[in-house]
């Protein structure tokens, strides 16, 4: 079990800690809770749905990588499938602050990479910043998304972001987490690069058409993917590398275990992720080889 999760267990109510420990000790635990597991925890602890989600936030925050701020934030989103996904903020020493991943972005992209097509609610340690409110406004469920904070009544995202600006204002009907396949192909025969291309085909980039995906290979051969999550307000967009880093972190891997990376993006786009991807990987480890393909 992740050492930080063990530490976080000590901050939970004793009955909850006892109930969740076997789940976290399971070798197949992937930083998610199935609907059945969550229902069992509700029955065992006699907590309400929102109380249980808030009580589990220290576990989500245990995944935080915050060497700069030392401000550890956790988030839990529930997909339309009923499964709960943990997420946490991530910061990178030596990279610009624009490369930072917020906890809300982490949990949402975690759910996205595992196949969810909608989010019903999100539970967070602290009130979501404007950046994250805008990021969430890109979701397929932005109009109905519920936000839960500790010791607060739940509110909708639209209450946190009144008179919001979103995809519809730019005449865009696609939304983040929507099912899509851009049909990009590459001449490369390398399987690792092909995995990055597959991720690019599921990316959300209706504004620039920069369909892009990243694959990261760990030292043990495990591969993690990320796909670009673009935003109507541009700046809150989440690059494909960041989504892959979330995927890797939530699987319990340290970022020092990255052995290889690949970036595939649309060749005729008005933007490129190459420079930022190179710079951030360089900050993590200058020896990580990066394969780049413009399709």
From Swiss-Prot:
<keyword id="KW-0479">Metal-binding</keyword>
<feature type="binding site">
    <location>
        <position position="132"/>
    </location>
    <ligand>
        <name>Zn(2+)</name>
    </ligand>
</feature>
<dbReference type="InterPro" id="IPR020797">
    <property type="entry name" value="Cytidine_deaminase_bacteria"/>
</dbReference>
<feature type="active site" description="Proton donor">
    <location>
        <position position="104"/>
    </location>
</feature>
<dbReference type="GO" id="GO:0042802">
    <property type="term" value="F:identical protein binding"/>
</dbReference>
<dbReference type="InterPro" id="IPR016192">
    <property type="entry name" value="APOBEC/CMP_deaminase_Zn-bd"/>
</dbReference>
<dbReference type="Pfam" id="PF00383">
    <property type="entry name" value="dCMP_cyt_deam_1"/>
</dbReference>
<dbReference type="InterPro" id="IPR013171">
    <property type="entry name" value="Cyd/dCyd_deaminase_Zn-bd"/>
</dbReference>
<feature type="binding site">
    <location>
        <position position="129"/>
    </location>
    <ligand>
        <name>Zn(2+)</name>
    </ligand>
</feature>
<feature type="domain" description="CMP/dCMP-type deaminase 1">
    <location>
        <begin position="48"/>
        <end position="168"/>
    </location>
</feature>
<comment type="function">
    <text>This enzyme scavenges exogenous and endogenous cytidine and 2'-deoxycytidine for UMP synthesis.</text>
</comment>
<protein>
    <recommendedName>
        <fullName>Cytidine deaminase</fullName>
        <ecNumber>3.5.4.5</ecNumber>
    </recommendedName>
</protein>
<dbReference type="InterPro" id="IPR050202">
    <property type="entry name" value="Cyt/Deoxycyt_deaminase"/>
</dbReference>
<feature type="domain" description="CMP/dCMP-type deaminase 2">
    <location>
        <begin position="187"/>
        <end position="295"/>
    </location>
</feature>
<dbReference type="InterPro" id="IPR006263">
    <property type="entry name" value="Cyt_deam_dimer"/>
</dbReference>
<comment type="similarity">
    <text>Belongs to the cytidine and deoxycytidylate deaminase family.</text>
</comment>
<dbReference type="InterPro" id="IPR016193">
    <property type="entry name" value="Cytidine_deaminase-like"/>
</dbReference>
<keyword id="KW-0862">Zinc</keyword>
<feature type="binding site">
    <location>
        <position position="102"/>
    </location>
    <ligand>
        <name>Zn(2+)</name>
    </ligand>
</feature>
<dbReference type="Pfam" id="PF08211">
    <property type="entry name" value="dCMP_cyt_deam_2"/>
</dbReference>
<dbReference type="InterPro" id="IPR002125">
    <property type="entry name" value="CMP_dCMP_dom"/>
</dbReference>
<keyword id="KW-0378">Hydrolase</keyword>
<dbReference type="GO" id="GO:0005829">
    <property type="term" value="C:cytosol"/>
</dbReference>
<feature type="binding site">
    <location>
        <begin position="89"/>
        <end position="91"/>
    </location>
    <ligand>
        <name>substrate</name>
    </ligand>
</feature>
<dbReference type="GO" id="GO:0004126">
    <property type="term" value="F:cytidine deaminase activity"/>
</dbReference>
<dbReference type="GO" id="GO:0009972">
    <property type="term" value="P:cytidine deamination"/>
</dbReference>
<dbReference type="GO" id="GO:0008270">
    <property type="term" value="F:zinc ion binding"/>
</dbReference>
<comment type="subunit">
    <text>Homodimer.</text>
</comment>
